[in-house]
Amino acid sequence: MTPLDTSAAAIFAANRAQGAVKFDVRLQDGMTRRGRVQESGSLRVRFPSPEAEGLSAVFINTAGGIAGGDRFDTDIAAGEGTRLTLTTAAAEKLYRAAGAPAQIRIALAAAANAHLAWLPQETILFDQARVARSIDIDLAETASLLLCEIVVFGRAAMGERMLSGEFVDRWRLRRGGRLVFAETVRLDGDIGATLAHRAVANGAAAIGTALIVPGDEALVQRIRDSAPSFSGEVGISAWNGFAMARFCAQDAARLRTDMMAVLGCASGTALPRLWLS
């Protein structure tokens, strides 16, 4: 590598966005209160007024989106008996990357009898975006979880589709110290052609996943009974002490509607207000 190459790499690295948020919540006088909050770079968190059913936190990416080489880290811990709902101020946009992929790391933990809800708005992948995301969840045996992620392959309203790029999504769920769910989704190269396969996404422009802990067949049946018809394709099942719903749709709005129906039935509480704005 020539000195010029080294200098170019250093300039590229220096211009990449980085952000990190780390905080915990604890029970105080019967209310969920935030503990120490650490923020750095272009990732911020804000806490609306505490509500009777728990504490809400909203993440804000002041960079306006994520590009190749960016890195964002989130570490959240819900203390014993707390109730915490996490969401984002807007959909996250992943832009075209000419070099290294963006790195997103999310670590969530919930202690005994805590309830943690991770409910971000959509992640939108632009054509030729590259991103590697990891979501690690560590639950106590008696903790509960409501988690969803929606991924949109391009902005359909603008006539855009993600045709190529790289999307790696690694999920790990531990409950009571045991690994109960592990999955890695990898899409690269001609992503448009891959999504067009009937056995993959049947041409869907948006996909989603919801995890519900604890979850069983009774919960699955209750969701099916309460929402007998969906706008897109939805599959729901339960095993190993949790329930999972998978979503595919031709547009993000329909998928969001289906996701809200499932989450509303599973939680029995209102979704974040930002989802309704």
From Swiss-Prot:
Entry annotated with the keyword Cytoplasm: yes
Single GO MF descriptor: nickel cation binding
Membrane-traversing stretches: none
Keywords: Chaperone, Cytoplasm, Nickel insertion
Residues forming coiled coils: none
Function in brief: Required for maturation of urease via the functional incorporation of the urease nickel metallocenter.
Quaternary organization: UreD, UreF and UreG form a complex that acts as a GTP-hydrolysis-dependent molecular chaperone, activating the urease apoprotein by helping to assemble the nickel containing metallocenter of UreC. The UreE protein probably delivers the nickel.
The name this protein goes by in its record: Urease accessory protein UreD
Organism phylogeny: Bacteria, Pseudomonadati, Pseudomonadota, Alphaproteobacteria, Hyphomicrobiales
Encoding gene, per UniProt annotation: ureD
